[in-house]
Amino acid sequence: MKITPVNEKIGAFVEDVNLNSLAIHEFETLYQALLRHKVLFFRDQPLSTEEHIALGQRFGALEPPHPFFPHLTDNDQVVIIETARGNPPSKSYWHTDMTWQVVPPKCSILHAQFVPEQGGDTIWCDMAGVWADLSAAEQSELRSLETIHALHAFEDSRYDHLDANGESIVIKRSRDYPPIRRPMMQVHPETGQEVLFINEQFTRSIINWSESASQLRLSALFSKARQVQYQVRFSWQKGSVAIWDNRATQHFAVTDYGDTPRRLHRVTVQGEPSLAGKPYLP
């Protein structure tokens, strides 16, 4: 197995490995590499649905079905991320997966089924690196702050529609996922790194701040995730796999390919109770 870092902060390519048949020592090497590099990239991995699920289960129990994303008919734990002719992707946002639920996921495994010849890259950002580069004064202030995470970003998206009563399905299902309050800084449960745990898509506001002050401060912090020194960018090919640590990163899907067909399958691993948020009760 050969592991080649992309840069000093985030990302590594893994070669000479078959994800279908990892020995125990190989999996442990990969796991430690994931903690170190935060996102791992693989080429030419012909995973079946069963093999994809089995790989995910080696990292932990899988998340139940996503409330909005489509999934495979024969296994609802495999999410389909797809663009088809006449159905281009929605607007993309920087995000950490599913921070709107009480316990955010541990990691995700994305497998490319077919992709455009050009475009459709994904970019990841090292949010531990962003936090580490804040000034001591900024860190001191942010440690005391909490933010609200919510499902609002799905409203009016391609995943939203009206039910038979004319009600938004996102708003309706959001009742099962009320807003969550989280510390702005969270400690990674395995590495001990401090992480700026906010994201553009699901972090709505800072608790006890005015709307204007909250958005101004969040926007300034979000802008740091757009700085290339914290990023790694991956170009997909058929059979490519990316595994990322959801507790230390956020990511962005580049939607520069119009409605060219693109399909990826994702399994997501449940997170640790130590990172559980609390219901927000205004």
Protein language model annotation of sequence segments:
Residues 1-241, 246-282:
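Non-heme Fe(II) oxygenase catalytic core, chiefly the N-lobe of the double-stranded beta-helix
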